[in-house]
Amino acid sequence: MLQGKNAMKPIAADRRTLASLTNSKLNKSQQEAAKIILENTDRVMGLQGYAGTGKTYMLQEVEKIAHYKGYNLTGLAPTGKAVRALKDANIKARTLASFLMQYDGVAAGRGTDKGRFDMKQEYKRRLLVVDESSMIATRDMQKFLTIADQLNIRVL
């Protein structure tokens, strides 16, 4: 994970774009979290908060700004229920298991240079949002982070 430190360009760092957060319905804590996500240059970020504090709601605002800047958010979650919650918030989502199955060859070190290049291009301007990460088995999280590292994927 250290090699992912300062490895990415920020999604949005200009004052004008970030000022739109103050005009949103987000509270101050949500605005600050959104600003950190949008300005961050690390490949892997963490977001922690109690249930019902508006993390997913805040991500809707992040998604709007990211989309405006040419980025997409994709949610990954360990359960179908968590995937549905992300989709209900208008965040494209799928199960982590389906993602791991699709990119199993990357985690195992198989594949061609062209295939890896194509996959990197697919995720070049995308933020993967992992919801309910505390429910993910350690082995699956390790596999996921290996894939994210190999494909240079930005993760929250």
Over which residues does each language-model region extend?
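Conserved ATP-binding/catalytic motifs of P-loop helicase motor domains
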Residues: 1-156
